[in-house]
Amino acid sequence: MSPFVQRVLIVVRRIPVGRVATYGDVAALAGQPRAARAVGNIMRDCRRPDVPCHRVIAAGGRLGGYGGSEALKRALLAAEGVVVSGSRVRELDRVTWNPRKRRTKRSRP
């Protein structure tokens, strides 16, 4: 297994339940921002139950490919509370995982 594949699997394992990341996001977090297609291929071929490949989607909220079926990917995401309509994730701003974005604390009145 190449170092890049190892980094991709580490990143994907960090995606929380109920969140998604795009192939491009995962590629960037794994150190190769132009390798979105490679991430897609890694996800397609991954058969490891400890890697939540279903949480990795295509740009714009499209479900993209999956080693299982698109219906299974849709069902797994829905079971985690991710709203999917047709072949797109809805409320993308709310469910996209971005570990680089810092959360700001809101002051209480």
Whereabouts are the PLM-identified features?
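Nucleic acid-binding interface residues in structured DNA/RNA-binding domains
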Residues: 1-109
